């Protein structure tokens, strides 16, 4: 049997086993835990293939085990659905590192294009890799026809031929005798809906697993394309940057004059409160910073930098934009602080602030790499910055932070949104149990009632399992005052 066929059969059998495991996890294991265990099953399947001598995994995959294990643990650590989605995104970034395209370029030199192609490569492998495995990798004509395999093939062919024959004769005999008809009907009374559900899940996850395992085990990796030089001159690229720099500079001057100038100055000019003034700009400023980064990357890529003088002028314009963006992000952070003091903290505000922190890191890394002629190092650094922010989010426990900030505001006499408090995940429950008793207000008791009702129902359903949900204290929540109704 050719080695490629032997490897293909091993991958196919492993994929079917993973499909069975996925079906079992989907039906028997609570949500969140099933995803973490599924990742573990995939890793164990790869190890089993290597230990059995069926495949040889690229050496570049070994260092990815540690971040994948940490992310799998993070999936079941916190209860926040938003953080769960971000952790899944982190798993996807590890998968992109494992793609043949990124492996070929090397993690230290893989650019953003390599990561994009690698992600597309994995997506395509998941969708169509199983078909290539069955139709191209496995030479079915080369399979041995003697011994057990021959007998097994004969049995399968015989069963396939016997089914329609038995169906025809059985139908005639059932019509001939009503007693026989009833006995056969009772014996073959099968509910096909659950069987179809199980079979569909096994085939779906087996199909996806076959494509993923195949591309991870593929020894040949695509050749990374060298970066092509830009063709545009400084007149085209520099004009765009200069105009944007002037616009940013004008905005920054306004920030120093009014936002950082105090509430009286703002109220006298606009007629609105300081908090209302700050409320309008946070998300817009973060969007401006997020759009500026790809614009700078595109400008660097499109500029013909063979002339050193032209390259230096471009870098000065880009560096000025980075400095102005830092001031604008500081303005956004200042606005968020005022906004939170007046209106409280929500998930959207918290995670947008975290995204802003990632932007600060990436903009600094852009200046340290791209503006110094080391563009190929930017992609991996941006990815590592994302991992750093993700780790900080998992350690910080966002929902607990949100609950703590809003409880502190309530203790200072500000209103507490009981409905929003009940929408937070189980990560916030310990903070509410500590903070609500010291309030002793009607709003606190309303929040306690909503929290008890929600988490009593969710725990009874056992729809998901996380460490935070399992460890959250049970029982009534004290609100520091007697409840009515």
Please place each PLM-identified region on the residue numbering.
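Cytosolic juxtamembrane regulatory segments of multi-pass membrane proteins
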Residues: 117-139, 232-243, 282, 390-398, ...
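Hydrophobic alpha-helical transmembrane segments in integral membrane proteins
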Residues: 374-379, 390-416
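Hydrophobic membrane-spanning alpha-helices of multi-pass integral membrane proteins
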Residues: 11-14, 40-44, 61-71, 161-169, ...
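Extracytosolic and intramembrane catalytic regions of membrane-associated proteins
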Residues: 422-485
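Alpha-helical transmembrane segments of multi-pass integral membrane proteins
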Residues: 120-133, 153-175, 201-207, 236-259, ...
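Transmembrane-helix bundle segments that line or gate the permeation/cavity pathway
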Residues: 23-181, 197-219
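Short aromatic-rich membrane-water interface segments that cap or initiate transmembrane helices
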Residues: 154, 187-201, 269-287, 345-356
């Amino acid at each position: 049997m050719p080695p490629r066929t032997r490897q293909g059969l091993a991958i196919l059998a492993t994929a079917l086993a993973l499909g069975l495991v996925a079906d079992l996890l989907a039906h028997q294991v609570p949500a969140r835990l099933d995803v973490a265990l599924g990742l573990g099953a995939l890793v164990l399947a790869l190890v089993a293939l290597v230990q059995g001598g069926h495949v040889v995994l690229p050496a570049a995959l070994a260092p990815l085990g540690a971040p994948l294990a940490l992310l799998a643990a993070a999936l079941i650590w916190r209860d926040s659905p938003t953080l769960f989605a971000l952790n899944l995104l982190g798993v996807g970034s590890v998968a992109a590192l494992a793609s043949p395209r990124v492996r070929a370029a090397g993690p230290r030199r893989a650019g953003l294009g390599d990561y994009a192609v690698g992600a597309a490569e994995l997506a395509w492998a998941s969708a169509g890799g199983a078909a290539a495995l069955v139709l191209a990798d496995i030479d079915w004509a080369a399979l041995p026809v003697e011994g057990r395999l021959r007998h097994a093939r004969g049995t399968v062919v015989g069963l396939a031929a016997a089914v329609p024959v038995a169906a025809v004769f059985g139908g005639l005999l059932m019509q001939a005798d009503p007693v026989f008809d009833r006995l056969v009907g009772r014996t073959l009374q099968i509910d096909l809906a659950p069987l179809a559900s199980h079979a569909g899940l096994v085939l779906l996850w087996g199909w996806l697993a076959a494509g993923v395992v195949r591309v991870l085990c593929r020894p040949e990796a695509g050749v990374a394309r060298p970066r092509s030089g830009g063709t545009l001159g400084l007149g085209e690229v520099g004009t765009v940057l200069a105009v944007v720099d002037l616009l940013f500079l004008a905005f920054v001057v306004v920030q120093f004059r009014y936002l950082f100038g105090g509430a009286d100055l703002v109220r006298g000019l606009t007629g609105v409160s300081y908090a209302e003034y700050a409320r309008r700009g946070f998300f817009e400023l973060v969007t401006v910073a997020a759009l500026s980064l790809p614009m700078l990357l595109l400008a660097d890529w499109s500029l013909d930098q063979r002339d050193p003088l032209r390259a230096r002028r471009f870098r000065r314009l880009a560096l000025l934009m980075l400095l102005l963006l830092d001031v604008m992000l500081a303005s956004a952070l200042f606005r968020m602080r005022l906004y939170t003091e007046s209106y409280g903290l929500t998930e959207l505000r918290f995670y947008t602030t975290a995204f802003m922190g990632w932007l600060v890191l990436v903009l600094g890394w852009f200046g340290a790499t791209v503006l110094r002629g080391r563009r190929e190092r930017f992609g991996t650094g941006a990815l590592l910055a994302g991992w750093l922010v993700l780790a900080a989010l998992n350690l910080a426990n966002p929902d607990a932070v949100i609950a703590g900030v809003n409880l502190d505001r309530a203790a200072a006499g500000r209103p507490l949104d009981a409905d929003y408090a009940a929408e937070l995940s189980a990560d916030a429950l310990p903070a509410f149990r500590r903070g609500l008793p010291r309030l002793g207000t009607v709003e606190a008791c309303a929040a306690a009632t909503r929290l008890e009702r929600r988490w009593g129902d969710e725990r009874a359903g056992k729809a998901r399992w996380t460490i935070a949900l399992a460890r959250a204290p049970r029982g009534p929540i004290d609100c520091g005052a007697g409840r009515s109704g």
